[in-house]
Regions:
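Conserved SAM-binding loop and adjacent beta-strand
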Residues: 71-85
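S-adenosyl-L-methionine
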Residues: 126-134
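Short, conserved glycine- and acidic-residue-centered signature motifs
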Residues: 77-80, 102, 106
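N-terminal auxiliary segments of SAM/dcSAM-dependent transferases
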Residues: 1-59
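Conserved SAM-binding loop of SAM-dependent methyltransferases across substrates and taxa
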Residues: 106-119
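Conserved class I S-adenosyl-L-methionine
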Residues: 94-105, 124
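Glycine-rich helix-loop-beta junction characteristic of Rossmann-like nucleotide cofactor-binding loops
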Residues: 89-94, 115-116
Length: 134
């Protein structure tokens, strides 16, 4: 069962396209391949196929770190995944660690650091410009 509020990736058979969406109760997903019921996705498991109103199979996957980074709105220059991985490696980022960051910008590095620190760690970010914090 996929919890509501989860970030999911819908993979269509039509040119193998990927769509990143947050699963919300009562919020069906509409596409050229038909309507995908939020309740049907909620009842499924990650990795399974759910059929649309047009009987087209859509694969439902859990969003990876890469998917999350691709979905960020970019107000500033973003740090790319290969650079984020190198920075996390050099910092020794991992579960339970606390990392202090100067400037969060578009949030790419902050997202990566949070991913590697996990639920037991934390990222403290100081941003001088208020508009980047929104």
């Amino acid at each position: 069962m996929i919890p509501y509020g989860s970030l999911v990736v819908y993979v269509t058979p039509n040119k193998d396209r990927r769509y990143i969406k947050r699963l919300e109760e009562g919020q069906d997903w509409h596409s050229n391949d038909g309507v995908l019921s939020a309740e049907a996705v909620h009842a499924a498991n990650f990795g399974s196929e759910v059929r649309t109103s047009l009987d087209i199979p859509i694969r439902v996957l859990e969003a990876t770190l890469h998917d999350r980074l691709k979905g960020l709105k970019r107000q500033t220059q973003i740090i790319y995944p290969k650079d984020i991985a190198y920075i996390c490696l050099r910092l020794g980022a991992g579960p339970g660690r606390t990392i202090i960051e100067a400037g969060c910008g578009s949030g790419g590095l902050t997202t990566g650091l949070s991913w590697f620190c996990g639920p037991t760690g934390r990222v403290v970010s100081h941003e001088a410009r208020e508009e980047f914090m929104k």
